[in-house]
């Protein structure tokens, strides 16, 4: 794993994603939804921005990457400032991993995978399994999937019995389907 030079960019994208997901500031931002409800999507977008910037810029420096990180945090995550050096340390790690990958040295990416990537993958698999076990889907008469906790089958029967709703002017009211 991590030894095919033709997949250099893919390996680097993976390493950036793992480092960004493991960065305590970003973990807190996602948990507390600093960027509204789509914070995880913005984190993933940020990873793409960092990959694009680092791979396109010749002689990229950690200071420049740190500035980009801070700018994105300010614009997208509403972060005024960060009190520690962690953005610079993250930027340094990203630049070092890219420079090593450009020399076909994938050892830093392997280390990131062993140290952080496996834990993230196991955590995600655990979350998926927990979600599936706690809320199994139930098939109802009209073959729509409804959550068991929802009481969706009883609600579906009520809607069928009610029929269309007509307003005072004689128009049929279109209602949004409840999930």
From Swiss-Prot:
Biased composition (Acidic residues): 140-150
First-listed, main subcellular location of the protein, grouped into a coarse class: cytoplasm
Composition skew (Basic and acidic residues), residue ranges: 123-134
Keyword annotations of the record: Cytoplasm, Nucleus, Ribosome biogenesis, rRNA processing
Compartment(s) of residence: Cytoplasm; Nucleus
Region Disordered, residue ranges: 123-179
PANTHER family: PRE-RRNA-PROCESSING PROTEIN TSR2 HOMOLOG
Family that this chain belongs to: Belongs to the TSR2 family.
Protein name as annotated: Pre-rRNA-processing protein tsr2
Gene designation: tsr2
């Amino acid at each position: 794993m991590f030894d095919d030079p033709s997949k250099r960019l893919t390996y680097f994208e993976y390493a950036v994603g793992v480092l960004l997901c493991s960065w305590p500031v970003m973990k807190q931002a996602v948990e507390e939804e600093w960027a509204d409800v789509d914070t995880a999507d913005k984190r993933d977008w940020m990873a793409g921005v960092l990959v694009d910037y680092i791979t396109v810029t010749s002689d990229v420096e950690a200071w420049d990457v740190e500035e980009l990180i801070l700018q994105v945090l300010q614009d997208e995550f509403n972060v005024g400032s960060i009190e520690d050096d962690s953005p610079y340390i993250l930027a340094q790690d990203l630049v070092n991993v890219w420079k090593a990958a450009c020399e076909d040295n994938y050892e830093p990416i392997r280390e990131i995978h062993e140290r952080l990537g496996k834990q993230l993958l196991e955590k995600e698999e655990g979350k998926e399994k927990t979600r599936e076990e706690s809320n199994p889907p139930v098939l109802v008469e009209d073959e729509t999937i409804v959550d068991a906790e929802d009481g969706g089958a009883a609600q579906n029967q009520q809607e069928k019995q009610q029929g269309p709703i007509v307003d005072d002017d004689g128009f049929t009211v279109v209602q949004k389907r409840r999930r």
